[in-house]
């Protein structure tokens, strides 16, 4: 496939009167802001002439200082996290231990003489980027497309949007980083192809399989690790230097490790005073990390159905490491594409998408996917999957549910995320209740539940009860994040326990059907005794006792067989009119509808 490289112009022609939106890559290590006009991209430089602005924030002399490599680092890793997760994750705790307010019930940091939430602190970085761009463009900026890791969940995405909003931005769209990178490559709209985007940033790793056809950039599958990136390579090298040369585990040693890593991308050895490390040693140190990324990429390819890929697109500064290119080629035997500066590919894509949203000039369309299945808890703890893993978004799905017991005046909805069959094994996202329903017999209420994921990956759930005209809607904003380790565990457990889960679900469904049948028939007998003789009532009770014994035995096959026996014998021996009533009850009709 022909690749069209988007080259940055020395001086793009941005007219003051035209509407402008920026693209922002809020990175773990570095952040960038760019604008596009007529498909020409310009990365905005900082006041000290840097395109890559370190994502660090310090507070000195009553002022925030951005990008001086001091103070709080890697704030991106904190988006969507709870205090409990921070305390239980050493890598995260080490980032914030000097700022953490452990007495708070939620995640707050002692910063700028205040207790601030993560979005409030991150907003200062967005403000800095905004100010730099406004100063150079001599215009106010209010609209932005912002990139996020493909595996950022609802909570993390919501906090990114909140931080940008605090900074004065209207977020036109959140776009997954691999998708933005593919867009930046400007794949020819008249060509077709399937690409693997390998995005190893400073603190996150994402991989996506994209199908590009006539301007449509469709994500088929996505995978990643929100706690793996180039910073982890730096840490491994730092540990080696500390152990080998008896150096302190300090910021200076970390900076030395980064310098060694960068030097060894184009040289065979690195020497600094009494410290030395060669390329072979470096590759031995980081090979386990690289192999982790390759495994994740292969999993993603399997999730996509193992399509033939036309190339691997490299994104992120860490991909300059020669070992990564070598291992990718070994694994996929396909061209490795790195035409665009890997540090800029994501922000270029965001800027191009921003331009296209405010002044459409191409027929391009970006379609992303949901990283995990979303569903709802039913009676008995069963999960009803409503939006499946890797479903293209935006999407809206409507399903109808009813009540299980008589005279319910409210329905509780429990929103879940995960691949398992039972609610206890999935992750709870949110709960809400539809109140004020008229008391009715079980099965009479009809509630329509709508799950909607927008283009930003934000989930909204609404419920509407037709008879009472009652409705309720929420935007799901869980107070916790979900990282790649948990996603992997969910998927692995779903695979390992698939048979157990399926059997558990079959049992629970059989029990629910049996209990509903027993309840309906016993009520029918009480209300329609004039239609039955004593012998017929005796036969019915005997058959119901068999069902009850099967339920007590917790044997789904026995339960199903006893239900079949009940239906068969009732059909053969009961009065025709009562038979019709029984059949209607078995179809879910209310007794008042059929009397």
Curated annotation (Swiss-Prot):
Disulfide bonds: none annotated. One of its GO terms (molecular function) is ATP binding. One of its GO terms (biological process) is iron-sulfur cluster assembly. Chaperone involved in the maturation of iron-sulfur cluster-containing proteins. Has a low intrinsic ATPase activity which is markedly stimulated by HscB. Keywords: ATP-binding, Chaperone, Nucleotide-binding. Pfam families: HSP70 (PF00012). InterPro entries: ATPase_NBD (IPR043129), Heat_shock_70_CS (IPR018181), HSP70_C_sf (IPR029048), HSP70_peptide-bd_sf (IPR029047), Hsp_70_fam (IPR013126), ISC_FeS_clus_asmbl_HscA (IPR010236). This is Chaperone protein HscA homolog. Belongs to the heat shock protein 70 family.
